[in-house]
Amino acid sequence: MKEEKKQLRSGFTTGTCAAAAAKAAAFFLTGDEKTQISLQTPGGRVAHFQVQKLVDGEMTWFGVQKDAGDDPDVTHGAWIYGAVSRISKDMGFRRSVESKSDRTCEKKETVEKHDVDQEAWTDGLARAYEWEPDTEADHSGQFRLFLTAKDGIGLVTKPGLSCPVGNYAINPVPRQMIFQSVTHVLEETEAHGDYLIQLWIPAGRELALKTFNPKLGIEGGISILGTTGIVNPMSEQALMDTIRLEIHMRAVAGEHSLILAPGNYGERFLAEHLGIAIDQAVTCSNFIADAIRWSADAGMSEILFVGHIGKLIKVAGGVKNTHSKYGDRRMEIMADCLPGTLDEQVRNEWTDRILGCNTTEEALEYLKSWGICDQVMHTAVSRMQRYMKQWAGGNCDVQVVTFSTVYGILGKTSDSDRMIERWRHS
């Protein structure tokens, strides 16, 4: 009897958890302490959370433990805390005002005086977002809300993200969720004045080291993310979005040349054998064709692609996504690169040998022993380059370097040395 495939369980984003924590804190400020919180996500699903109170000095926080479902999310199980306080003493702070007409986080910034609780306004809380609702229906106008963060939420240090440089990485949709959740509570009590919402993730700084944040220029913590409020398990789209965002950020920074590497092998090879710093490269995983296309669309004029032969040999066969779930034609493609001048009987015998190999490294041993490795690799990298240029739409120069962990550089296209030398000294 065929076993039914297990249905994977979805979870909630950091944005949804932060909104729930802030909502619980808002209730507490009104004198109503909750142990459970419900809210509707932008995707329409109603989320229910158990909340935990934590008293830290004179601050009272309410926490929600993130449940990412069956998604392999490093933030699964992390506690996300929120606090809401009345701003009551004069103290200047910088705020980033969210424009009604633009939710892309290109904000106008002003410096003003507001009443701020001295104990709540500690170092690291120097910037805050102020909510300006889209319509009067969103907010009665009797109070103002400001949103900032404590430890564990990263600070944006590079342009091109959906939050301005110098602000905490709290993305537009989560910000709106947080503001609306607190607004709904405060309006029930006819609140007046200014209120400060703070977020805190105790493990955020450590967790961030396991994410793309350091590479994206988000320092000191994780991001508060989400568009639908729901985490869909095993999402390829999330990884693709991250890769595309990093390429976009480099273009925004004025870069016109790019290094792409599928993964850790390529990055290590760049550093150890080519003398190029790891952080110079964008890791594109298995999304080879997509990364090339995104780079061309972003305006890159040059791409240096460096990857292990075990992955790039697939590209020589026109494979756009090198994940094994799309098939494994490595040996067939390798055999197809054998010299056309071979005697038919020899070619058939050598083809059978290659097709019987389990790894590309094993196949390379045969090619080396037959004295044709350089010829085969020249053919392979030429084909890789041809396909990559096609995927770029003919809009940029693509050079390729492929290597083996045993034999080092196996093949490279004609102008790759020039690009390597320039990157080495950049």
Protein language model features and the residues they cover:
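Cationic, low-complexity basic patches in intrinsically disordered or flexible, solvent-exposed regions
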Residues: 99, 114, 131-133
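Acidic/polar hotspots within intrinsically disordered regions
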Residues: 114-115, 123
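A structural signal for small-residue-enriched, beta-sheet-centric alpha/beta enzyme cores
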Residues: 9, 15, 222, 227-246, ...
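Generic N-terminal targeting/processing segments that precede catalytic cores or assembly contacts
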Residues: 1-91, 121-210, 214
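Short, amphipathic C-terminal "tail helix"
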Residues: 396-425
